[in-house]
A protein has these predicted regions:
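A cross-kingdom feature marking charged/low-complexity
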Residues: 120-123
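A structural motif corresponding to the C-terminal lobe/cap of the Radical SAM core domain
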Residues: 1-116, 139-140, 197
Length: 200
């Protein structure tokens, strides 16, 4: 069984959402928690219009809109460092040796036991912890990186460009460079234009 959680919702504030999620991990050891960072997907949700009106949507290109590589929405009730501190703490708690062992013995059958174990010790568990720690480090030490996260710059940090390069390998040379840039407010502009046209 996998249980899915979205971190960074506008209703979240303080320690409570993260601490209560830890209690869930304790109370349901057989479940595999899947954590997603809140992501605004274009026109998929009308709520995205509100986010765009508030100027909170970031211009992360499509390769990073996978719920964990980037959160393309500035949190409403957290500063970035504080948010990543809490995400890292929760993820470390969820994929600690103790939690992995409890999940292993709570599940019946060889396949779910070992599948959950491998997910925990590979990219989905320990891999994400390493990644989130690097993002936090960049937020602290790299002003241009932080400016992008604060919406003060639209220049995608080289950290993320290098991820795309690594993923594409030899195909990077054919990747259209304009695809790195993305209008995060296209939905809002489209709505405003259609409203003006309908009034006219």
């Amino acid at each position: 069984v996998q249980t899915n959680f979205v971190l960074g919702l506008d209703s979240d504030a303080g320690e409570e959402p993260f601490e209560l999620t830890k209690r869930f991990v304790d109370k349901t050891p057989g479940a595999f928690p899947g954590y997603s960072l809140l992501t605004a997907f274009g026109e998929a949700a009308p709520l995205n219009l509100e986010y765009q009106r508030e100027g909170r949507v970031l211009s992360f290109p499509f390769p990073f809109l996978n719920n964990h590589l980037a959160m393309n929405l500035k949190p409403k009730n957290y500063e970035w460092i504080d948010f990543y501190d809490k995400v890292i703490d929760l993820t470390e708690y969820t994929f600690s040796k103790k939690a992995i062992w409890r999940r292993f013995i709570a599940n019946k059958g060889t396949t779910p036991k070992w599948m959950n174990f491998m997910r925990a010790v590979s990219q989905e568990g320990h891999g994400r912890i390493r990644f989130y720690k690097q993002v936090r480090k960049n937020l602290l030490e790299d002003a241009s990186f932080r400016n992008y996260f604060e919406g003060q710059s639209k220049q995608l940090p080289s950290f993320y460009i290098n991820i795309i390069k690594e993923d594409l390998g030899a195909w990077w040379q054919w990747f259209p460079k304009e695809a790195i840039e993305h209008n995060a407010y296209a939905y809002l502009h489209k709505k405003e234009t259609s409203t003006i046209l309908s009034v006219a």
